[in-house]
Amino acid sequence: MSIVPKETVEVIAQSIGITNLLPEAALMLAPDVEYRVREIMQEAIKCMRHSKRTTLTASDVDGALNLRNVEPIYGFASGGPFRFRKAIGHRDLFYTDDREVDFKDVIEAPLPKAPLDTEIVCHWLAIEGVQPAIPENAPLEVIRAPAETKIHEQKDGPLIDVRLPVKHVLSRELQLYFQKIAELAMSKSNPPLYKEALVSLASDSGLHPLVPYFTNFIADEVSNGLNDFRLLFNLMHIVRSLLQNPHIHIEPYLHQLMPSVVTCLVSRKLGNRFADNHWELRDFAANLVSLICKRYGTVYITLQSRLTRTLVNALLDPKKALTQHYGAIQGLAALGHTVVRLLILSNLEPYLSLLEPELNAEKQKNQMKIYEAWRVYGALLRAAGLCIHGRLKIFPPLPSPSPSFLHKGKGKGKIISTDPHKRKLSVDSSENQSPQKRLITMDGPDGVHSQDQSGSAPMQVDNPVENDNPPQNSVQPSSSEQASDANESESRNGKVKESGRSRAITMKAILDQIWKDDLDSGRLLVKLHELYGDRILPFIPSTEMSVFL
Amino acid sequence: MDPEQINEFVVGYLKKKGFSSAAKDLESYHHQNNNGSSFTSVDYHNDPELTKLIRSFSQQEDDPTRYREGYSKLRSWAYNSLDLYKHELLRVMYPVFIHCYMDLVGKGHTQEARTFFNSFRKDHEMVHLRDLQKLEGVLSPSHLEEMEFARSLRKSKVNIKFCQYSYELLLQYLHSTVSTLMLGIINEHINFQVYSGQPTSSSDDIEAVTIVGSFQDTANHINQKEIQWGLLEDSLEDRLEKTGGLLSDSEKGQGESKDGDADDSKKRSTEIGKQGSSLKKLKKDKAGNATAKVARLETITVSPAPRVKPELALPVMSTDVEQSILEDLRNRVQLSSVAMPSVSFYTFVNTHNGLNCSSISHDGSLVAGGFSDSSIKVWDMAKIGQAGSGALQAENDSSDQSIRPNGRRSYTLLLGHSGPVYSATFSPPGDFVLSSSADTTIRLWSTKLNANLVCYKGHNYPVWDAQFSPFGHYFASCSHDRTARIWSMDRIQPLRIMAGHLSDVDCVQWHPNCNYIATGSSDKTVRLWDVQTGECVRIFIGHRSMVLSLAMSPDGRYMASGDEDGTIMMWDLSTARCITPLMGHNSCVWSLSYSGEGSLLASGSADCTVKLWDVTSSTKLTKAEEKNGNSNRLRSLRTFPTKSTPVHALRVSYAFFTRINSTIL
């Protein structure tokens, strides 16, 4: 009949005190109620349109009632939209969420903030028909423009023509912004401000027109400022922020960015002062490289192969400095364990034999060299370890490690912990680490022991890793970062593996794979064991370890 | 058929119709003289058609299911008919549908009417959604009486153009299926205009949309009237052209060198943009460019618009104002699809959902907003621009008492209305603000004194819109009371009342020559009224929902109107025909504005975009192009999305760019 059921009419009648409403009367009234409601709504919609709105509000209904000379219903024109709640148990019955408010609460509540006054802001929506890419404008066009340039690039390359409007409309604000960022990057005096700047770079929507300027800036400064460690680090942070910014379409500029990043990874010398921790910079750059490869590898198919070729060349060239080797190893390691297995492990044996003399304090007189060699050794070990860890992790989760095994692992930790002390002696003399850091590393084994007793489960598993990995542990300057790194290594590796091995292997396929890989991995493990001795063991997940042992 | 049967039919019919006594009389009469030979004046025996017809009368006259059956049969027949004639036949369906529905409602079969309506409403929702929404609420015979829309539908006939063959097809069908009910409805409510030849293409359907037939007749009749759409004699544009010649003579030596510059100017401005110089510089550059273009202007206006005499006594313009306008005109840059305008976007922030309307003065220096809390706020953009450097503004505040009477406020607050303000517009020189409100009044404010000058009472319902004439002094208003009125500033009584719209008059706009006003209404029509006589001289039919915005081209030849659905229609005033619908917006078109030369149309919409349309090309489009159907895309030049900000008002300023403002909610 009508959408207003007669029961509703009856209920309303009761609520206003009419108890003896005949059912027939209710039935007659129902269609009329619907008609009147529609009439009011029609007028309310007119009011809404003239208020230039597209959502109907209570005030529009009041306006419509006014038009019909009906007294408006008071108490609803609160401004905000109503919250409707679904009545439980009914499909399409709603009621307004009208909570009871305690008078005391209202009185005691602090005064609300005064509402902001109306203001006008002005900006250019378009300049001669072109929409400038400023934060006030919707970022739609901005993102689309580079895609077009890419297409043109591929077709017939009138690149300049198409990109011109974007450059052309570089507003004064953007220029100031760019200048400020550049200054901050160069000045290295105000770290908190610089951090803010990086956050802004990573999140602002209107920055797209500045991207070519930033890439240029970074390329220039990296090539000029190889001696300035702080600057390089700042620049790499900018790169990372730009990569993080979801509004920036950085693809067309990658070819400009990559050389700078790779330079920071495998350059012979980064920074001129002794204290400059270029290892950290290399690690950071390695992460950047892997990020870029992961995100844009699918678009630029040659990207990863070119990159790995560069890195492998750097690694396998014995004339290159150890620092360069280190960078190359870190870069390759960051690309995932498949890369490591294919490119590093295959070359591991000859390389280690080459590295051996450098490690030995008797043969190599230069302390610095020894230190570097150990760094490289550590990086290699880590890469290999993560690789084998990743491989073993492919196996489906086995039952959780038995406590007895944990003890075994700890036992090993103890056994090997003699090693680092030896090495540290050699390192300490040459290394100018901060005392505090050294303290941590010195404390390492003891701390583990005490924790072993107290028995905090997650730490127990990870701490041996730290111990058993002496080169990393003893020489890593930011030990805290490294420690967390090591802590995460297990979980992260799991993730890396998952994403890396994205070819969806079904459970059954996994099982097949296991038996095939089992031998393979076993062999690999044995080989690594030969090369590294017991140091590789902590990388092997405990359960698998029990299998292999 | 023997007389006995006939008697039965007649008696049955009378009983059905409720004439029981007459039926009894008849029966008794027949019993008395049983021979019954007196009835056979018509030869029923040889006319089976007629027999069936009569039989159907006596059969279940009241049965509501017959409507459903008849309609669904007709529908399936129409949908299965020949493709060539199908769209014509389908036009019949809508009137039949709504009249079936109203018949059912009228006879009290509310339940059946509802189910009938719901089962077939999908067919017509595309085109007639708004009407259906209105009709849906009609549930009892009294509603039919009460609702104006339904009444007008019942009273009038629908005109449908039919080609000869379609008409025959339809008649044939109706006769062969003996669907007397449908035949009755069609006869009663549809007026066929049969023409010979091939059926028209389906794209011409626009005229088929409007349902009120007699209305169409009057519209056609009215549209025969002559109108003088030309510009005024001795207008400033005229004078400019005269003086422009002189100017270009005197500047000839200079002008030639400038011409060369002008060609370069495009390049130069892009260079400047690259270097990122300030906006001011850009403006200056354009201004320099513009003087060179004035000379060109003459050559372009090959066919000048005809000149007419003003029918109103127009106010005398002071020489200062005249000079400044002339200056502006000279500086005007010709916009086209190649030379796109710049758009300056004013955003109202912190309006708390209260901004109802906004407008920009002709020179772009003032911006006014009308709010639902009865207030009007006026911003002086020049002052905001000056103090734009942020920190300085705060310091200036205390010293700048005259501008900011309430201390920290950056705008002038005008209080006086007692209901939501629905429009606020500036007089052409920008010294007055006219506002209209839900409190049924129109108020005149002075921007110099920041005070209310006059309150005009006359409308009986909320005044939706008020607009100054292009020369000031006179203004037009329109209201929920279905009238539009003409006022002059010095009288508190309206000079003219334009009545005729069938529903609210939602927007009003002056013709550039001041002799006409156009009104857009909720009855989906746009009307043009003669200001002097107060008569309606044009009715523009074609919109499918309420008309929200109007704009007149500067040469007075065309008009654009935007509606609730986002359709913009371009009309030729002299023929009252739609030149082209401009589709693209998908929500209400709040405002429209022509560029100074009339070559571009800007539209602002609730879908948070500003669109620019090339209207010169659309008027010159050949028939063939129009048939391709992709002409829409050609006309839409640019779309500027905003950051989810509905666009409320647009003004193409004299100089060179469009200004738009809007609100963040």
Swiss-Prot record, chain A:
Protein location: Nucleus
Gene Ontology, cellular component aspect: SAGA complex; SLIK (SAGA-like) complex; transcription factor TFIID complex
GO molecular function: protein heterodimerization activity; RNA polymerase II general transcription initiation factor activity
SUPFAM superfamilies xref list: ARM repeat (SSF48371), Histone-fold (SSF47113)
Compositionally biased spans, kind Basic and acidic residues: 489-501
Domain Histone-fold: 5-78
Disulfide bonds listed in the record: none
Listed GO biological process terms: pollen tube growth; transcription initiation at RNA polymerase II promoter
Keywords from the named record: Activator, Nucleus, Phosphoprotein, Transcription, Transcription regulation
Gene3D superfamilies: Histone, subunit A, TAF6, C-terminal HEAT repeat domain
CDD domains given in the database record: HFD_TAF6 (cd22931), TAF6C (cd08050)
Primary location class: nucleus
Highest rank taxon of the organism: Eukaryota
Cited function: TAFs are components of the transcription factor IID (TFIID) complex that is essential for mediating regulation of RNA polymerase transcription. Required for proper pollen function. May stabilize the interaction of TFIID with selected promoters. Not redundant with TAF6B.
Family in the record: Belongs to the TAF6 family.
This protein's name: Transcription initiation factor TFIID subunit 6
Organism, as annotated: Arabidopsis thaliana
